């Protein structure tokens, strides 16, 4: 809201009216000019007409951004009908009060040590300063997005129909299916079935990676109503989990990280029943939905080529997800065989998944080549041995997570039965399989490589490969055996096999697979809902790092598509896009609300060029920041410090009258720095608090007499003592000091403490602008050493004196790491992760700076040859 001043001039007197639209409606008659000799009652309209020529208007600024990205706001300091004259101030700004400079606040401070929290000028703060927003500041950030000219034309700001269709909400459980006819083939606009991913937005470190639709073609299906199934709610969080890829460098970082999965919701949606009795991989290519560590699995059955393989194991994947209780997600087919699922908090449900034709041709045999005692092999035959598997889920408390006990029931009379493998995914990302045979149980950890399939080869089966190529593969980090249960910990990424072939040339097994990899989780639906139809963020939207501000598209011109792009284009029946995504994202460590948007027209564009009508977009984002541990504060005497801790009000030291201290300062910061003025300020502020007086002390007041400052302070303290009848304000035995009580114990401290009101300021050096951490990051091009600075994600850099310290301590291994693999050893920093993961010794290498030094000598004409001697055999030499 803009405030406007109206000044009406009459006989050198100026009267002002602070006018807002609300006041114009409520105030119809106001006496603007009143004086002893000139009393002229006027209403607003008449005053404007009579004194139109002498009217001056001033508009106040609100939420203006300063050069330091702080907020400047002007507020009126005059009232309606008040007389003003030349030189009187009309309004205050953010940094003024009653026309005087005011950058801080008067708060109660005490100079005393407190459990070491004010070591080295650190500051202890009361939480009331945060609760009442005493030092809360507003920060305005400005972002500019320019429209650039490329060789293929100008960029455009818009929502692409290819990436952001109006029906994108159907992804998230709102409109998965249509029911136009009872039977229909695949329709492009209505393109999702259970387990088929419609559209995947993948994000890493705030950058949009892929905007493509992956659709599986279903030949024939029909719709049934009133079927309940689970649909994930996509909630994006910028965590380290989304930043992990197949690079072995990131494996060590993610060792101890186990992300909780996203919650699941239940919707009533139509059920799909396939017209085919067998859901084979030829007709159904399941693309699995994977959100962080939550896997929404689907029903899948193997398609086996009998001419090439005899030993086989049917992999049956049940779709079970646990939230607080385990909900079913199932298909139903009219068959006698099936799986009985007993829920702890519900009734039993029987699901019929089995391929009747396949089971009828399966029987168990023992013996044969490479047979172990007690091991069963599956061969294709004429008889079948069918069983019911009763999975009773019982919740147990083990190591803080839910544990599922899985056992078999209602088996046939035969000893050797056809066992199936079940994959159960809980909300703690724990995967359990059937128990292996007791004779072959193991307790040692088993390492699984990232690219190895997560379908476990049980010893009871002679399995060459998970034959369902069209199914999914899981990439995991750690596989171990616990209580005879296979357990996969921390599911890391998901590979979806979309094609492939398998054949056996001679006695060797050759497998060619083509798969998609989803590594980083999915972006939430709201990331695009806050954009308007033009692709620009809406005013008033709250944003966080990584959110899209402007959806900008950049022309890319002709290019050679990759095989994956050709596959996606063939599935979607789309032509290759002429634009690529160049969206602008909220920068790192930026939180706040969009409070201003300015759209400027483009310049210097040819008239025949089509553009979106936008040349530059400017955004203003406001952020409210309270004081926090690590922020810098200071007084008016150079007494600066960092906030070390924020204590509750009841734990802070308090005065004899029960007033808790707002801030505790280090008393050692006074004598050595010769700024005793802060002590006088504190005591005089205490006297002024109870006397309700405001003091202006002349600098160098000793010219008026010896010890003028001391005399003024003591006299005012004594006056305050007499006025309030509180003797602790001034004690003649220890003037300027008082007894302080401990807020935690209630006992008073042994020594008297200097306490009073001082003027403390919050500096612009905030911890949000300073804090920085890096594991691995960019390296300089020439020296190959970590770059410097927080803005460039710089790393740790050790200088000559730091190396001296390590040498003095004899930390040889740390010294080697700092000088080589953590600095500029290109080969060593790549091999060290492999050495740690595989429990191999770290090889010694040489830094890149040594190679640069040798090349500089050679550039000067000095031929310098160097060799590395072997650690144990000096005759073995290696050239550098």
Swiss-Prot record:
GO terms for molecular function: DNA binding; DNA-directed RNA polymerase activity; ribonucleoside binding. Its EC number is 2.7.7.6. One of its GO terms (biological process) is DNA-templated transcription. Its main location: plastid. One of its GO terms (cellular component) is mitochondrion. In L.terrestris the gene for this protein is split in two. Belongs to the RNA polymerase beta chain family. This is DNA-directed RNA polymerase subunit beta C-terminal section. The lineage of its organism: Eukaryota, Viridiplantae, Chlorophyta, core chlorophytes, Chlorophyceae.
């Amino acid at each position: 809201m803009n405030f406007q001043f109206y000044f009406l001039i009459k006989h050198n007197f100026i009267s002002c009216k602070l006018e807002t639209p609300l006041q114009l409606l409520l105030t119809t008659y106001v006496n603007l000019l009143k004086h002893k000799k000139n009393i002229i009652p006027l209403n607003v309209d008449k005053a404007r007409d009579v004194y139109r020529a002498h009217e001056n208007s001033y508009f106040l600024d609100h939420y203006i951004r300063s050069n330091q990205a702080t907020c400047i706001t002007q507020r009126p300091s005059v009232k309606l009908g008040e007389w003003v004259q030349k030189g009187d101030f009309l309004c205050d700004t953010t940094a003024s009060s009653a026309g005087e400079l005011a950058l801080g606040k008067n708060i109660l401070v005490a100079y005393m040590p407190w459990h070491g929290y004010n070591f080295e000028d650190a500051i202890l703060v009361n939480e009331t300063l945060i609760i009442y927003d005493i030092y809360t500041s507003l920060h305005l950030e400005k972002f500019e997005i320019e429209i650039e000219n490329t060789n293929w034309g100008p960029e455009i700001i818009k929502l692409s129909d290819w990436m952001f269709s109006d029906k994108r909400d159907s992804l998230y459980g709102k409109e998965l299916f249509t029911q136009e006819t009872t039977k229909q083939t695949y329709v492009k606009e209505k393109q999702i079935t259970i387990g088929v991913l419609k559209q995947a937005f993948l994000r890493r470190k705030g950058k949009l990676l892929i905007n493509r639709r992956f659709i599986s073609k279903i030949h024939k299906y029909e719709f049934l109503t009133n079927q309940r199934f689970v649909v994930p709610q996509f909630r994006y969080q910028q965590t380290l989990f989304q930043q992990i890829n197949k690079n072995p460098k990131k494996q060590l970082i993610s060792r101890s990280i186990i992300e909780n999965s996203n919650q699941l919701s239940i919707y009533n949606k139509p059920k799909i029943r396939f017209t085919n009795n067998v859901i084979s991989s030829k007709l159904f290519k399941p693309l699995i939905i994977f959100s962080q560590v939550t896997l929404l699995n689907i029903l899948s059955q193997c398609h086996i080529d009998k001419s090439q393989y005899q030993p086989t194991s049917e992999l049956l994947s049940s779709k079970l997800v646990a939230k607080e209780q385990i909900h079913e997600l199932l298909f139903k087919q009219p068959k006698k065989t099936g799986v009985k699922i007993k829920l702890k908090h519900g009734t039993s449900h029987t699901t019929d998944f089995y391929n009747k034709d396949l089971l009828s041709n399966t029987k168990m045999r023992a013996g044969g080549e490479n047979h172990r005692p007690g091991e069963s092999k599956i061969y294709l035959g004429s008889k079948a041995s069918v069983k019911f598997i009763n999975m009773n889920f019982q919740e147990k408390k083990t190591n803080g997570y839910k544990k599922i006990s899985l056992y078999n029931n209602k088996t046939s009379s035969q000893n050797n039965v056809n066992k199936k493998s079940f994959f159960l995914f809980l909300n703690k990302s724990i995967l359990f399989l059937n128990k292996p045979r007791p004779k072959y149980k193991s307790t040692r950890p088993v390492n699984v490589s990232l690219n190895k399939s997560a379908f476990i080869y049980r010893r009871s089966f002679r399995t060459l490969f998970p034959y369902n190529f069209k199914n999914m593969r899981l990439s995991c980090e750690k596989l171990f055996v616990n209580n005879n249960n296979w357990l996969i910990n921390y599911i890391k990424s998901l590979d979806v096999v979309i094609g492939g072939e398998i054949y056996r040339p001679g006695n060797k097994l050759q497998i060619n697979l083509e798969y998609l990899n989803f590594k980083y989780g999915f972006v939430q639906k709201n990331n695009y809902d806050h954009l308007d139809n033009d692709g620009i963020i809406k005013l008033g939207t709250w944003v966080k790092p990584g959110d899209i501000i402007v959806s900008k598209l950049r022309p890319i011109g002709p290019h050679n598509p990759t095989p994956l792009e050709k596959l996606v284009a063939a599935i979607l029946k789309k032509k290759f896009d002429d634009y690529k995504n160049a969206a602008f994202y909220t920068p790192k460590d930026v939180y706040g609300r969009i409070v201003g948007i300015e759209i400027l027209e483009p310049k210097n564009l040819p008239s025949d060029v089509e553009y979106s009508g936008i040349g530059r977009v400017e955004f203003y984002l406001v952020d409210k920041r309270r004081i926090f541990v690590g922020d810098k504060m200071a007084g008016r005497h150079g007494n600066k410090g960092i906030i070390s801790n924020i204590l509750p009000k009841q734990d802070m030291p308090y005065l004899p009258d029960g007033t808790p201290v707002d801030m505790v300062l280090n008393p050692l910061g006074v004598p050595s720095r010769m700024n005793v003025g802060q002590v006088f300020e504190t005591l005089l502020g205490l006297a002024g608090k109870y006397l309700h007086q405001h003091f202006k002390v002349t600098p160098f007041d000793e010219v008026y007499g010896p010890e003028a400052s001391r005399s003024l302070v003591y006299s005012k303290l004594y006056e305050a003592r007499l006025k309030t009848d509180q003797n602790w304000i001034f004690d003649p035995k220890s003037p300027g000091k008082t007894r302080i009580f401990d807020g935690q114990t209630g006992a008073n401290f042994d020594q008297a403490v200097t306490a009073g009101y001082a003027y403390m300021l919050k500096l612009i050096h905030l911890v949000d602008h300073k804090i920085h951490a890096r594991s691995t990051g960019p390296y300089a091009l020439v020296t190959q050493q970590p770059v410097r600075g927080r803005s460039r994600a710089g790393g740790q850099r050790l200088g000559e004196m730091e190396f001296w310290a390590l040498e003095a301590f004899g930390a040889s291994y740390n010294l080697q790491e700092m000088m080589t693999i953590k600095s500029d050893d290109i080969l060593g920093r790549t091999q060290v992760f492999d050495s740690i993961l595989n429990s191999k010794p770290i090889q010694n290498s040489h830094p890149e700076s040594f190679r640069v030094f040798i090349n500089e000598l050679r550039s000067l004409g000095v031929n310098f040859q160097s060799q590395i001697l072997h650690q144990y055999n000096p005759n073995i030499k290696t050239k550098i």
